[in-house]
Design a protein with these regions (language model features):
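N-terminal FAD cofactor-binding segment of flavoenzymes
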Residues: 41-79
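N-terminal Rossmann-fold NAD(P) dinucleotide-binding loop
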Residues: 15-16
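Glycine-rich FAD pyrophosphate-binding loop
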Residues: 7-9, 20-45
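FAD/FMN-dependent oxidoreductases across multiple families
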Residues: 226-309, 313-317
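C-terminal helical "tail/cap" subdomain of flavin- and related membrane-associated enzymes
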Residues: 2, 301-381
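Conserved FAD-binding catalytic core of PHBH/FMO-like flavoproteins
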Residues: 154-244, 253
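Short beta-strand to alpha-helix junction loop
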Residues: 48-51, 92-113, 224-230, 258, ...
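Conserved N-terminal helical subregion
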Residues: 70-163, 172-176
Length: 381
């Protein structure tokens, strides 16, 4: 018998993973899912996660098959110096992998299958009309359903968040778009690369031997001015950067706006925001989903601690402790990525200083060690 009930609104990656992991704690989980599954499987984005986060979800999600994830032991960083592309820093792991890359749609399909066989996770495909933070219920038409904890994980923006944050957040509109595509090739591309170009950072994320995803963050004006030829420009850029003779195919070209949004308020009473709604960061550093996974891990640990002590989830210390624990790292990462993006912007006034720093950064091994540790396990407070 499951005495305590958790409601998760949203069936994206964050919502699905949270449902499975929290469902291990002998509670009832109701997962409110989208009625339109077509949109989920049109998500052609690719995500990178750290070694420690990979081990965590592999063990907790019981992922027996390894072919969902492409391991990378190395990531190479380049910057555009006038008309030259210079490799200024490389991160490499010998005994373990630096990161794992997967396609969102493939992992979502797997998570859906896992949830279907879980007796304590119920999928409800109904539209939520309202959420009452004070009394802890959701409204489905005239019906009210009460929960011990309500988790909102409905993407970067949702009207459901408004009753919690009241517009309080650290925000920035970059006036940029992330241009994503899937590239098929016949070359040997096994590891990730990040190119800091004058138009904006471009990432290469392989997810199998003959395919990789690219994410190019570009100015909105540049995109609009070159919209008709953007595919040709992207292909020519990739061929030149990777020194390819040709590519076999480019597909699934999509674009989405880039914003910084760091919530300053995470919860109200027993309602919590989780996932992109809590923190949306620049895709340049690939840390967004790592933060989400560390959030889920912390929430699970706090719930487990409360249940072990025989405490109720409702009106407990859990959400306050979660906020105090996770907000510092989430904000530091978000603002740090923002500063990194500003540093690599094409600015002629700061270019001489930037050039000097990047030409000498390889000498400072401690920077690499610290960066590697933080990107893998986060900032430990």
């Amino acid at each position: 018998m499951f005495e305590q009930k958790i409601c998760i609104v949203g069936d994206g990656l964050a919502g699905l993973i949270a449902a499975i992991i929290l469902g291990k704690e002998n509670v009832r989980v109701d997962l409110y899912s989208s009625n339109n599954k077509k949109n989920i499987f049109l998500d052609n984005r690719t995500t990178a996660i750290s070694e420690s986060n990979y081990q965590y979800i592999k063990n907790n999600l019981e992922l027996s098959k390894q072919n969902l994830f492409w391991p990378c032991k190395k990531i190479n960083l380049f910057f555009e110096n006038e008309k030259k592309i210079i490799n200024f820093l490389n991160f490499k792991e010998k005994k373990k992998n630096f990161m794992y890359i997967f396609q969102n749609k493939d992992l979502k399909k797997k998570l859906d299958k896992i949830i279907l066989v879980k007796n304590n996770i119920k999928i409800i495909k109904k539209k939520i009309e309202n959420i009452d933070n004070e009394k802890g219920f959701i409204a489905l038409g005239k019906k009210k359903i009460f929960y011990d904890l309500i988790i909102l994980s409905t993407g970067g923006t949702s009207k459901l968040y408004s009753t919690i944050d009241k517009g309080r957040s650290i925000e920035k509109n970059y006036e940029e778009l992330a241009l994503t595509a899937i590239i098929k090739h016949d070359s040997k591309i096994e590891n990730a690369s990040q190119f800091f170009l004058k138009e904006g950072p471009l990432a290469i994320l392989p997810f199998n031997k003959k395919e990789f995803s690219t994410v190019w963050s570009i100015n909105r004006h540049f995109f609009n001015s070159n919209k008709k030829n953007i595919e040709k420009i992207l292909v020519e850029k990739i061929v030149a950067l990777l020194k390819l003779k040709k590519i076999k195919n480019i597909s699934n070209i999509q674009s989405y706006p880039i914003n910084l949004n760091l919530k300053t308020k995470y919860f109200k009473k027993n309602v919590l925001i989780l996932g992109d709604g809590l923190h949306t960061v620049h895709p340049m550093a690939g840390q967004g989903f790592n933060l989400v996974l560390r959030d889920i891990k912390k929430l699970k640990d706090l719930i487990f601690k409360a249940l072990k002590l025989g405490l109720l989830i409702k009106n407990s210390f859990i959400l306050k402790d979660f906020y105090n624990s996770r907000k510092p790292e989430n904000n530091l990462f978000g603002l740090g990525i923002n500063l990194t993006n500003m540093f690599f912007k094409n600015n002629k006034f700061f270019f001489p200083l930037k050039k000097r720093i990047l030409n000498n950064i390889y000498r400072f091994n401690f920077i690499k060690k610290i960066s590697r540790s933080i990107s893998d396990k986060g900032i430990l407070f």
